[in-house]
């Protein structure tokens, strides 16, 4: 290292030391904490917020694509896509995972379409799920705010943004113009809710639908409902689309859905994954586990043969699923092993 470069580094270190020991800075920090409370200003490297708290999405493949092992706590998440693409099912799986951890979840059913039996099929304890079916958009957002302010809810799902119709529009005539009412309502609400969500550490999932913009010749004509505020305030945006049917002896038993992480403020964005949703079962968790065990080389695959710790399991993916099903403890141990590897990636 040259003498000139060494002197420059030493001078920078001296200036940095003087800055941190500055009497004026210490007084300013003291005054800020006095006025706004302890923790209102902090050193990022010494902050408790350095490590993002998460909970599983219910899909190991999606947890992997999210980059932090699941959904972040205290953030806004938007899940959008065409109709019948699996958006609500994904959200219900998130509720199930929160309940497994002993947390409390709520579902704001603006579409008035939640099926209790389907929730139970996915593993949700419906006796511990709070549900609201609001009359209009303002009422839904007021209920959302009150639940967040309780500081007792871990996850709230709003289904859907498209169904959050402003009261003015509902009370008016069919011929009345209502351009921009919903967008203004969402923008006003989210400016306030964003801070409350972070403070309460509540995760809020907004389910949204796609619409086509009129007159678009070049570029993508598709857009989400509710204006641009939700796009801005969301930490994660997931685009969900149906990819193909899952067949068993020519019978359709489910769908494969492609998920793209369009926005991610917590990790690398634009990752994609494809997960399987089975009818009356939801996410094919064992199938995902098998794929990840092979991907991380925990289970070895040679041709059609699978083996674990030098012991042959059998031929084909189905034999591995049967091998896992035979021992619940084995499933739990290997799942935890995969989760640790996902967080390390």
UniProtKB/Swiss-Prot annotation:
Disulfide bonds: none annotated. ATP binds at residues 81-88. One of its GO terms (molecular function) is single-stranded DNA binding. The keyword Aminoacyl-tRNA synthetase does not apply. Keywords: ATP-binding, Cytoplasm, DNA damage, DNA recombination, DNA repair, DNA-binding, Nucleotide-binding, SOS response. InterPro entries: AAA+_ATPase, DNA_recomb/repair_RecA, DNA_recomb/repair_RecA_CS, P-loop_NTPase, RecA-like_C, RecA-like_N, RecA_ATP-bd, RecA_C_sf. GO terms for biological process: DNA recombination; DNA repair; SOS response. Its main location: cytoplasm. It is found in: Cytoplasm. GO terms for cellular component: cytosol. The keyword DNA repair applies. Can catalyze the hydrolysis of ATP in the presence of single-stranded DNA, the ATP-dependent uptake of single-stranded DNA by duplex DNA, and the ATP-dependent hybridization of homologous single-stranded DNAs. It interacts with LexA causing its activation and leading to its autocatalytic cleavage. PANTHER family: MITOCHONDRIAL DNA REPAIR PROTEIN RECA HOMOLOG-RELATED, RECA. Belongs to the RecA family. NCBIfam families: tigrfam_recA (TIGR02012). This is Protein RecA. It comes from Mycoplasma mycoides. The lineage of its organism: Bacteria, Bacillati, Mycoplasmatota, Mollicutes, Mycoplasmataceae. The gene is recA.
């Amino acid at each position: 290292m040259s003498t000139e470069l060494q002197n420059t580094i030493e001078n920078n270190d001296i200036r940095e030391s003087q800055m941190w020991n500055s009497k004026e800075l210490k007084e300013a920090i003291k005054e800020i904490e006095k006025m706004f409370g302890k923790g209102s200003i902090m050193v990022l490297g010494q902050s408790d917020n350095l490590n993002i708290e998460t909970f599983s999405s219910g899909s190991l493949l999606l947890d992997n694509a999210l980059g932090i092992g699941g959904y972040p706590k205290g953030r806004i998440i938007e899940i959008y896509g065409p109709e019948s693409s699996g958006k609500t099912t994904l959200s219900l799986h998130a509720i199930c995972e929160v309940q497994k951890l002993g947390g409390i979840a709520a579902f704001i059913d603006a579409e008035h379409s939640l099926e209790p039996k389907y929730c139970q099929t996915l593993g949700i304890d419906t006796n511990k799920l709070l549900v609201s079916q609001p009359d209009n958009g303002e009422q839904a957002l007021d209920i959302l705010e009150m639940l967040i302010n309780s500081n007792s809810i871990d996850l709230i799902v709003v289904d859907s943004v498209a169904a959050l119709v402003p009261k003015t529009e509902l009370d008016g005539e069919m011929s009345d113009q209502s351009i921009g009412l919903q967008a203004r309502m969402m923008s006003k609400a989210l400016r306030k809710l964003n801070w409350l969500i972070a403070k309460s550490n509540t995760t809020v999932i907004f389910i949204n639908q796609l619409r086509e913009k009129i007159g678009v010749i070049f570029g993508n004509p598709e857009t989400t409902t509710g204006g641009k505020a939700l796009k801005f305030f969301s930490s994660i945006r997931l685009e969900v689309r149906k990819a193909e049917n899952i067949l068993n002896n020519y019978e359709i038993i489910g769908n494969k859905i492609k998920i793209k992480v369009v926005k991610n403020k917590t990790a690398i964005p634009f990752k994609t994954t494809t997960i399987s949703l089975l009818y009356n079962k939801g996410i094919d968790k064992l199938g995902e586990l098998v794929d990840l065990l092979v991907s991380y080389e925990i289970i070895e695959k040679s041709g059609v043969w699978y083996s674990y710790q030098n012991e042959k399991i059998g031929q084909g993916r189905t034999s591995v699923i049967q091998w896992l099903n035979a021992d619940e403890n084995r499933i739990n141990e290997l799942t935890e092993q995969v989760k640790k590897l996902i967080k390390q990636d």
